[in-house]
Amino acid sequence: MRQADSQTQPSPAEQETPQPAGPSNRSPPTMGPQQTGSRKRKAAEVDQGAGTSSSPGPAAPMATAGEGNAEGSMLLTKRPRRPVAHLSMVNYLKGRALGADGHPGLAGFEGDLRSYGVLRLPELLRERQLTLGPLNKVFASQWLNARQVVCGTKCNTLFVVDVKTDHIMRIPLMRDRVPDLSRGPPSCGIHAVELNPSKTLLATGGENPNSLAVYQLPTLDPVCLGDCQGHRDWIFAIAWMSDTVAVSGSRDGTVALWKVDPDMFNGSIAWHKDAGLPVYAHISPTDMEAIPKATTNPGNRKVRALAFSNKNQELGAVSLDGYFHLWKARSSLSRLLSLRLPYCRENVCLTYCDEFSLYAVGSQSHVSFLDLRQGQQNIPPLCSREGGTGVRSLSVHQHIVTVGTGHGSLLFYDIRAQKFLEERSAANPDMFPVPSGRKLKLTCGSGWINQDDLLENYVAGVEDFPNALYTHCYNWPEMKLFVGGGPLASGLHGNYAGLWS
């Protein structure tokens, strides 16, 4: 998820075309010769009219009759006034109410309003915690519509929550065609939930976290399961390259390309007569690529996050060995480069910024910006030290980066200004708020935690267990933010979900 800095607009007076000077009761010019007036006064009037015109007009023909004072009149063609674009809030709202989509200046004004809203929204957000019951750690989330968010958890639960009523609807997970009976209950959970560009398909993990599951929207009927010749370990990341092509990254160090055939949709809504379960196809990847082994840490090349650039048709990935990888993504994947990241500990999140053609990588203490067009990092990394707990979720919209930390807070960074957004305050209620110099930080609530885990694993009396914010997603049309997470410590069972609006 480029806006140029807004420039000063000319005033209405500057946009209008001045008319030739002269008395208002002046008689209109005629074609016949006129004998009144002197030559000098006539010349002065011509000079004055030429000097006050904003742009040169057609030459005024002069007809002369006889000698001496006899001369023709100058024909001045009156220029039509240009329409004035009034860039005011009142005119904008009037035009929008009347459906004036093509009104001059409205498109640019709407862009300025959106940019201003993105910049000012964080300081206006207020939290309402959602109740999720005993679910453990929300790892992934996406808005389905204005009221519903679909989430995946560490306890391998896929559910939809209504942010107005807190109602939870669980979604059945798809099972492999040949279940692995030797594999115990999954301890990985669902790390990725992604919608295709048209929001008609949802990709996530299956009951086996090694498999890719695709559901149809808005019904959430199962479409297909990628469990054939695919990943051998947990899926950590998913990205859509088009409406029918998805790519997944796994802990086994591979990236897989999946083609979802639209013909599957009709068959997926049929039902088994005996089991009462929906039918879905079982598919294989069309291409698989292995992450190259690093010389420094060859055993830890797990793919942790993916991001797709639709503009460049390129796929970026980060692996836990501290490398960033880039592929050209067409019908297959062709690797372009692999480079060592400047901050290589706990690289667990990645996003692409269309506004600046940048990849942003979250690590233990920094967010690094990669501009691959320049072959260098020309935007300094931002430091997000929050108790050493690292960056756990990351998103970019226009020029604002939202950072979810492992210490229960949200930070906001302006790429244009290359600084964090600041709190705004006023000396008294009658004054306009101004930046205070303090970093704007939204601190999330306590959520829910299993008290039995506290008694078994931690010292009694310790109450400060902030939630790691593993996921967040915006609903920009309604200016809402969903945030999910849970305790950072692996031995603690709990969850956090909040609606910020």
UniProtKB/Swiss-Prot annotation:
Pfam families: Beta-prop_DCAF12. Residues 1-67 are annotated as: Disordered. WD repeats lie at residues 185-225, 230-268, 298-337, 384-423. The keyword ATP-binding does not apply. Residues 1-37 have a biased composition (Polar residues). InterPro entries: Beta-prop_DCAF12, DCAF12, WD40/YVTN_repeat-like_dom_sf, WD40_repeat_dom_sf, WD40_rpt. Coiled coil: none annotated. PROSITE patterns: WD_REPEATS_2, WD_REPEATS_REGION. Keywords: Repeat, WD repeat. Belongs to the WD repeat DCAF12 family. This is DDB1- and CUL4-associated factor 12-like protein 1.
